[in-house]
């Protein structure tokens, strides 16, 4: 089972993503934490050491790309964004995929 955290400032987007992951992946992913800011997300990720991070590109205190650079670990990163034009930039910083928010 993969351990995952969600770093997303929009509560509804966090809830929808958690529902999708928990309801449709037959216990393959366990959500072990969630955060609504980049700083708190960095601290959580470095403490819990997840396998996967679902990371919003635009957070209230920093960009998701800066969160990625500040991590002490190298988990799989899946960026979430409302703008598909961030996809190329996401792949440039070694994310494995991205989700356009509409989930």
State each model region's role:
Residues 42-103:
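CheY-like receiver
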Residues 26-27, 39, 46:
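Detector for Asparagine
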Residues 1-3:
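Non-catalytic signal-transmission and effector/linker regions of two-component phosphorelay proteins
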Residues 11-33:
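Two-component/phosphorelay signaling modules centered on CheY-like receiver
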Residues 35-36, 48:
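ABC ATP-binding cassette signature C-motif
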Residues 8:
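Conserved acidic carboxylate
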Residues 11, 36-42:
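Acidic phosphotransfer microenvironment of two-component signaling modules
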